[in-house]
Amino acid sequence: MSLLNCENSCGSSQSSSDCCAAMAASCSAAVKDDSVSGSASTGNLSSSFMEEIQGYDVEFDPPLESKYECPICLMALREAVQTPCGHRFCKACIIKSIRDAGHKCPVDNEILLENQLFPDNFAKREILSLTVKCPNKGCLQKMELRHLEDHQVHCEFALVNCPQCQRPFQKCQVNTHIIEDCPRRQVSCVNCAVSMAYEEKEIHDQSCPLANIICEYCGTILIREQMPNHYDLDCPTAPIPCTFSVFGCHEKMQRNHLARHLQENTQLHMRLLAQAVHNVNLALRPCDAASPSRGCRPEDPNYEETIKQLESRLVRQDHQIRELTAKMETQSMYVGELKRTIRTLEDKVAEMEAQQCNGIYIWKIGNFGMHLKSQEEERPVVIHSPGFYTGRPGYKLCMRLHLQLPTAQRCANYISLFVHTMQGEYDSHLPWPFQGTIRLTILDQSEALIRQNHEEVMDAKPELLAFQRPTIPRNPKGFGYVTFMHLEALRQGTFIKDDTLLVRCEVSTRFDMGGLRKEGFQPRSTDAGV
């Protein structure tokens, strides 16, 4: 019932108060009828639904005109409706206002019923045709408002929860996060192949039964489940008590010193054993001569015989211990000789491998993340490569990598890379000082067809000490670059893979320098004698 109809029904003879009373009663009846019919109609919105739906909270381009703005939520009209008094509202906003604040227009307080609202399809079409910006951070696309919902479904910058850790990420980042960064991503133990979440791996590594651990006494590497038996039975340097500790010897020594201890303290052990036998003898004597116990009579004929047998056995065991000690010392000498032989053979194998590289050596530096962390904590990091030869015969060289500290002057946070000459097998047959060209390269480990290696080429300078024949195993003077590569460039590229950095050194002596020259590299100045 409109206000106009209410005024006409009142008549001129009635007072204004009677008119208002009739109008209020009519409105109350209309609200009651409308509320009943609304409960069965799908066109009306539930209160909980209306609380969630307001206007379009998006950024318009150009900015939204005020005529399309809802006076209640101050956002763009959603499902625009118009009142008899000519005002526009979001459908959900005005229905909620009527039900919460009373049957009146929020703008001019005119009487307003729900059944008086009618859709403003013209405004709806106009608003849906306006251009808006995607609200997702990083997305620069613009589209009509009617297409925004479909765009957000496929937008690569929309936030979605990681299915494993439930943290929000943009769609374009979630796959990388799941594979590389998610604390709940599945990883396998390299030792026992058990699958677990990444965040649980550190705890698992501390208790994995198949993980390699180092014996704290002898340095032997064993799997964790073997370590208890190793401590109890095998470890040569594990501390153990004397065999005669039960008789009163309180000495503790390494297991490999036990035989010597037994040999050097035989007399002491015999005295302790005799004292223990004497104490047993006293314990077996009757405490009361008037009422001797039959079970502990000293005149038992087998008692003294048993003591004699035990003493005889002790003498034999003492001789056996001496013999075993002598054998063990002999075997220890053999083992020492075998260890020296093995060490010599290992050195020869390493020397032969170094001679096979023919002047091209790739140095694999593992656990490089640990070295970077040490550098960030301002702990010096200096690493030397194994030696390698330029040929057979050839010069023996090695590389030195130094991570400069953040506080270093003029070279802070740089990788310094140098080459050192070493004493080699063929030094007496080679011309000195060393002359040639050296190419140093940090390899790009990406899968790209064209890899962006970082490399420098330098010529040897015979007048420097770095290229003279070394008089000690490794020449203390090096030749190379203090500022070979900045650590920031290293981190931004794909130079580190599986926590490993690859450094390549290619050496051409004065007899085969043509290969490097043909590639057009011009050496830059180096930092000599560092």
Swiss-Prot record:
Gene encoding this chain?
Traf6
Please give the name of this protein: TNF receptor-associated factor 6
Q: Name the phenotypic consequences of knocking out this gene.
A: Abrogation of IL-1-induced activation of NF-kappa-B, MAPK8/JNK and MAPK14/p38. Animals appear normal at birth but become smaller after one week. Show runting, failure of tooth eruption and die after three weeks. Exhibit severe osteopetrosis, thymic atrophy, lymph node deficiency, splenomegaly, and have alopecia and lack sweat glands.
Q: Which residues form a coiled coil?
A: 299-356
Instruction: Quote the function comment for this protein.
Output: E3 ubiquitin ligase that, together with UBE2N and UBE2V1, mediates the synthesis of 'Lys-63'-linked-polyubiquitin chains conjugated to proteins, such as ECSIT, IKBKG, IRAK1, AKT1 and AKT2. Also mediates ubiquitination of free/unanchored polyubiquitin chain that leads to MAP3K7 activation. Leads to the activation of NF-kappa-B and JUN. Seems to also play a role in dendritic cells (DCs) maturation and/or activation. Represses c-Myb-mediated transactivation, in B-lymphocytes.
Region entry Interaction with TANK: which residue ranges? 363-530
What are the disulphide bonds in this sequence?
none
GO MF: histone deacetylase binding; identical protein binding; protein kinase B binding; protein-macromolecule adaptor activity; tumor necrosis factor receptor binding; ubiquitin conjugating enzyme binding; ubiquitin protein ligase activity; ubiquitin-protein transferase activity
Per UniProt, residues of the MATH domain are: 358-507
Where are the annotated TRAF-type zinc-finger regions? Answer: 150-202, 203-259
- One short Pfam name that applies is zf-C3HC4_2
Cross-linked residues, Glycyl lysine isopeptide (Lys-Gly) (interchain with G-Cter in SUMO): 124, 142, 461
